[in-house]
């Protein structure tokens, strides 16, 4: 087969093909004087030889070994574009070499008696294509080479500069006779301009061999049913080898044995462009048109030929065809699917009535000017057997190389052209010469599949810079470059489907701005089509080169090319990977694809240039209709997790995306003790967490909370942890003030009890962390398991708000030896002021609070109170207005005792109490402790082993705890419960070395003592049970110290002795205050510390059945004697009305009157009754509100 240079007429549609293929005035030996390409099938060819003096350069074409009776070669004219301008000086001689014809061309029916140079009609149909011409019979015998007809002697059959021809093959039952087709006309001037604009010369085009092809001898029988379409070879002009584009590179016989890797590589080079935007496109309307018209396509070629005359729009699908075309074979043998497609010559006169789909991207106007990558349809429609081409409005045409069979043959010929007047006219004729052999004969699957395999391998590895791989399956813009009409050889039914009967007209002055693919108005349609794609695993893996090559190299690909093959080959061209960044810019379907493994288009280059910090986050969530714009997978997931669910991608690959080596392992137990503080603005960014859940649990809903010095600052949303790595992407900006510790707490949500449970936690020491560097990436070790990857940044550092607290200042109260504190305060007492003030305030207003010392106060308020004691313990006031929550004060007191360097109950005292317990154990009964009074005195004497300051402090503390325990009927804090709260505090054996804060013990005995919390509780319980009650100790000691607070101590009242059985005989049982169910004085979350066994199960469930078992503390009866003692006042300041006898339906006015009772009442006689009346008031109010029978009167 001759190699056709880039300036050949077959490539550009001028006169180049004819002028370069035949000498002037000569024709092929077997060429009749008829005009059309169809005559090539009816015309006999005795020899395939050039008729001019110009020597031909040939290469061996693919042969059909089953049919070479005449020794003829399968020569296929190749139209290859070139970027070279060196051919501008080339001119065709007067007698170009004759155009060689194939014997099988005699089966192409064309119109007869048309001159080669005669322009085609403009009236919407071409005479050469008319029905009467199509019905002209072609002789089965071969005509002599000397036969002549109109225009034969004038030169090349492709001389007409404005027209083009289509070689079509009909069914075998059609008549045979001389018919004529108009050749494509390509001028040298146009060809040179196209070559200059094409820029399609690649490295593989330079080293083409120039051999002489053997002459064709003998004859070859042409059968209407079996004969393959063979296109005659053309003459080649002598051009430099670096500018020569061989004909065989654009025309491939699907006969597998003759397809070589070199030709496939050159084929790929030809279909790849640089710097041009696609002209044609796949729109939703276009796909609908394909489906609609494919159902209407007749199987009869005669009917199709008749329809072809009146059809004004012919769609050449640039991408995949419907399923019925992908799965059907069209030709019967390997010799029957030679395709000859020539797209050349612009003819504005042909575009008025026949507009091809080459410009059908204008149909996308109703779709928002979009174009999609091909999406094969699953609809099984009828098989279309006719191939019809008409005139086109498009200036340029480009079709995918192997993605679909546009023609039934396996040989591929592409022609590309630029319009000469593309900017001034949108009417361009793209006459197409196509050859199709017998309509429904199946193709041998091995040949075309081999071609596709080799072709895809070439495409998969070819990644030259500047090659627009993505452009190959699409039509080029008529105003922005060149295009190719590609007829691919595959085993599918490859035919051109007609376009919509009402396509949008071509817009002359505006081409679609493909650089803005965001103008997509139908994401729902894309999603629907994408869901169909996901049925094929190869396509849902974004069709990477690796996946494509693995598929093509498998031995299972020998059957006919199915939809899988077609789709893979196509996406090899438009692979949205790093091979072609320009192609990725226009890869619209990858953005609008529900497969989250496909990288987004906008973020693609960014991800290539630098590693993304995160992948999933909650990120962008699809609303169910519009596809996701951003990927949920990392770069690892995009490469290795194709087709997987988004959960698998986002959870399993996020750990690989972050650079774990960049995170420094951080453990709180390894950090030195820090007494400094820091203030400023801190940024915390979570990257992810690891090993948060046990492997046996399928999933866990968790969230992470940020605490600064035990104060909640921020939290994440509820996240689902399904794998060992929890992907996170959360940033928080937190203001810190005098902060020390950043605590990261992971909570797990338990839906059954509907509460949060601490899963794990980790702590970071902020002052030490930010001492040198302000930014740290830490892998914080969590307890009891797990790691959390976090980036902590101190964006701004402020001065500490505590005036007396510098960042390097050591604490003076907390964590300091008690003797040093007392010496520094120097107030004449042996007890630190913190203990004194806290105990005094608790006894003043907290002894009757339920759960005292068991409930936790606000961490923020506790921190504030701690700082106040650190500044000046003498100036701290604990009045109720400033600290209304008594639990804050109790919390600070326990913190102080817990942080003492040495416990108050020393090891010596601990052992002494254990000996006393062995000698004189507790004698407990229902009435309480029944030990001898001597045991109490002996217990007090046990403290003599302590130093003076520790002894005085412990005595004050035990007195206070004994007083609190005396109110256990109200506050439920018995000696046992108090021992549970204070045992680990007073007996902790904590000794911190200078470098680490983890606990160390000098010997095994101390270790056993520190871990034996039960013993601690028993020791303290023994002391409290035998400790004598000294109620006025605190009052006497504080009267001299704080005279200004003397009056406040009058609120302390001694509770009356409680009867063992409440006598209800003299009271109205209906007026007795009944505790409300679930009446709590504190939140539920604070009520589960320590041992509540002494409270019993019926504490909150008091009913009528157990009324006699309930202890009511000073609950008076509601009779008329309540107000009798309130008639006299000591002062005139407050006037209290005599309350009327209260009944069950007492009025609210009475309650308000009783609330006005002040401390001016005689404290000796009325204080107790006043308190009881207030309790009654509150109880009655609650009861009335619960019954919704409150009668308010003001």
Curated annotation (Swiss-Prot):
Highest taxon in the source lineage: Eukaryota
Any one cellular-component term (Gene Ontology): cytosol
Site (Arginine finger): 854
InterPro entries: C2_dom, C2_domain_sf, Rho-GAP_regulator, Rho_GTPase_activation_prot, RhoGAP_dom
Residue segments, region Disordered: 1-106, 133-182, 1057-1080
One annotated GO biological process: regulation of small GTPase mediated signal transduction
Molecular function via GO: GTPase activator activity
All residue ranges annotated as the Rho-GAP domain in the record: 816-1031
Known function: GTPase activator for the Rho-type GTPases by converting them to an inactive GDP-bound state.
Name of the protein in question: Rho GTPase-activating protein SYDE2
UniProt source species: Homo sapiens (Human)
Lineage: Eukaryota, Metazoa, Chordata, Craniata, Vertebrata
Gene name linked to the record: SYDE2
